[in-house]
Amino acid sequence: RRSSDLDELTGALIGLAQAVGEDKAEPETDRLMMEGLFATLTNVNFDDDSLKKQIEAVHQETAKYVPGCMSCQEPCGRTADYSMEKLWQDQEDIRSLKSLLLFGMRGTAAYAYHAMVLGYTNDQVNAFFYKGMAAIGQDREMEDLLPLVMEEGTVNFKCMELLDKANTETYGIPAPAKVEMKVEKGPFIVISGHDLRDLKLLLEQTEGKGINIYTHGEMLPAHAYPELRKYAHLKGNFGTAWQNQQKEFAGLPAPILFTTNCIMPPKDSYRDRVF
């Protein structure tokens, strides 16, 4: 079920990219493209209703760029949702290159989204999402796709620079820090993933309320940033790697805040404590 929803969302994003074409997209379109690609990463979203809402939002955004397509009596299909089944059934080399391009852009979109919520964007990075997604929906030869895959690598490197700039200018230069691995007595919240802004907001909202905060998994590096480490109630780190969460969270007497691509399908033993 989830796989079909993710394919449907990806196909809708390809249709949006075709509709935008070589025009400069609006900021809201960029956000939808980033969020959509991000949502299709592994371990991000297991909520069918949420994915359906994203698909509908993409359709509405596509209609803004090509309003005539919605009422066309002889649709060409160029801006319609792309059927991902066509990609999965394509010739092996074409399928491999398009998949590599798609999976790379999904990762880049995650970086770009985290930078965007801190107020940092890059026009070259954003523009490539449309270029790359449109190419996936078109009939392309290996000679066309391989340079695009290489370009995605370059764009991803630029996006990593952008995210590093966003994080360090917002939270300070990271420095080695000692992190406590034991949980103290008293109320606490565990936060997982790697959205530093979510952690910052959580620290601000719980400051002075007697609630301790513990990172988990990919959030561990947050302790290195001065503007986050300065909060006395950021006490330490809980647990081990993300793939052990279903076992480790089962008996955890605290809410767990998931922020990015770190969540596994929650078990009933702790589902009601997941946010």
Describe every region a protein language model picked out.
Residues T10-I173:
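Electropositive, gly/pro-rich neighborhoods at or near active sites that engage anionic ligands
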Residues K98, T108, E218, F238-A241:
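Long, charge-dense tracts
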Residues Y171, I191, I213-G217, L257-T260:
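General beta-strand structural signal in soluble alpha/beta enzymes
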Residues F188-G193, D198-G208, I213, W242:
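Core alpha-helical transmembrane segments of integral membrane proteins
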Residues L199-L201, H223-Y225, P265-S269:
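Short helix/loop capping segments that flank catalytic or ligand/cofactor-binding pockets
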Residues T215-H233:
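Short connector loops at secondary-structure junctions
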Residues A232-V274:
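Phosphate/diphosphate-binding loops
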